[in-house]
Amino acid sequence: EKPLYPLEHQQKIDQIDDWISHKYLPSLFRGAIDGPFDRNFIKTSWRLAALVNAQTPLPFYIRFIWPFGLRRARFINDMSQHIDFSLSIKDMHMQLFMELLEHIGDGPFMGELEKPTMLDFAVFPQLVFGYMFGLEEQLSAAKHPTIKAWLARVSEHLPENPLLASDKMQVNSLKEALSN
């Protein structure tokens, strides 16, 4: 049995889960809230629309206006209540990256736990999605040796495509990125 929420680590897991829910995950939407509305944002938005369309067909006009819709999406704007806008996007990402390193600590898994928990499975997909599905050319999270090693350890407990996106839309292999 592999419990995702072992009760003997309940306090530690709850503390890190609060960080994930109220800081880490909302930060992923920062660029859609107040990032530059430039060619890269539009390209990334259209790729996201294509990924959604592969699972649930969308009319062309919805895919076309996707970049504008992201800026106005209620769930994204609701997330903004948890974001510290006093930091630049770059500084916020650096701060969260350092906090992620602290939460992994000496590992092998988040919270310095011996087995992966819901914490690892909540953060892992966020770090690999962009690379696996063509939103970024390199697995940027794997540039740091601690994160790369953690990603490799977590990936051993997951299928080849651990994400909720169509296999046919996957453009990069996680295994390949982690073996370099």
Describe the residue ranges of each PLM region:
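Acyltransferase donor/substrate-recognition loop-hinge adjacent to the catalytic core
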Residues: R47-I83
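GST superfamily/GST-like fold recognition
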Residues: L113-M132
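Acidic, serine/threonine/proline-rich low-complexity intrinsically disordered regions
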Residues: L135-H144
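A non-catalytic, amphipathic alpha-helix used as a structural packing/dimerization or gating element
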Residues: K12-Q15, W19, S88-Q95, E99, ...
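A mid-sequence, solvent-exposed acidic-amphipathic segment
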Residues: F68-G111
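GST-like domain detector, emphasizing the conserved glutathione-binding G-site
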Residues: E1-F60
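Charge-dense, extended regions
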Residues: W150-N180
